[in-house]
UniProtKB/Swiss-Prot annotation:
This is Segregation and condensation protein B. InterPro entries: ScpB_csome_segregation (IPR005234), WH-like_DNA-bd_sf (IPR036388), WH_DNA-bd_sf (IPR036390). Its main location: cytoplasm. Residues 172-181 have a biased composition (Acidic residues). The keyword Cytoplasm applies. Keywords: Cell cycle, Cell division, Chromosome partition, Cytoplasm. Residues 167-198 are annotated as: Disordered. One of its GO terms (cellular component) is cytoplasm.
């Protein structure tokens, strides 16, 4: 494959890795390239992003992993986007992700992915942007993944005084406890929405 194809693959991998980032070891394994080639690719991609004023992203190295991030120069616009009131309801994916975080916090994105069986980068970004979820530190060890927890805005939005007010799991021995968590959460969510409409 040529260099441009490698850049495209690298960007896709960095996007998919999200906040967890991508280590050079992962990159060499997935792309079947040497460690030196991986470092060269990362350096060249970093130069493309960081040295180009018309690009909105930069490549960061944090705790031995590489991840895409927005440029600080654009923070004002990102803040406006987050502050713009949105009447849109949360998607099913976002609600499922929120339920998992609420019951299992603090939890990493990869742990949420494992429960849902799909990538949850998008739903987590949505929940963070809406102020329902925030990151609270990182796990120890390789990758240093972010730990996600719910916020006081989450409690307000769902009419809870504290996390102890979350619906209790009726049967922890159920065939699918993860589904049980989500069903209880959605029931509570729907009840709070009905009360708002009255």
């Amino acid at each position: 494959m040529n260099r441009e194809e490698q850049f495209g693959i690298l960007e896709s991998l960095l996007f998919a890795a999200g906040d967890a980032g991508l280590s050079t070891e992962q990159l060499t394994e997935v792309m079947e390239i040497t460690h030196i080639e991986a470092l060269n690719l990362l350096e060249l991609l970093s130069e493309r992003y960081n040295g180009n004023a018309d690009r909105g992203l930069i490549l960061l190295e944090l705790a031995g992993t590489f991840q895409l991030a927005t440029k600080k120069a654009h923070a004002e616009y990102l803040r406006k986007l987050v502050e713009v009131p949105s009447n849109t309801v949360l998607s099913q994916a976002s609600l499922e992700t929120l339920a998992i975080i609420a019951y299992r916090q603090p939890v990493t994105r990869m742990e949420v992915d494992e429960v849902r069986g799909v990538q949850t980068d998008g739903p987590i970004r949505t929940l963070v942007a809406k102020g329902l979820v925030t990151d609270k530190g990182r796990v120890d060890g390789a990758g240093r993944a972010k730990l996600y927890v719910t916020t006081s805005e989450f409690l307000d939005a769902f009419g809870l005084n504290s996390l102890e007010d979350l619906p209790k799991l009726a049967d922890p021995e159920a065939d699918d406890p993860d589904q049980n968590e989500m069903d209880l959460f959605f029931d509570r969510f729907n009840q709070s929405k009905e009360q708002e409409e009255e």
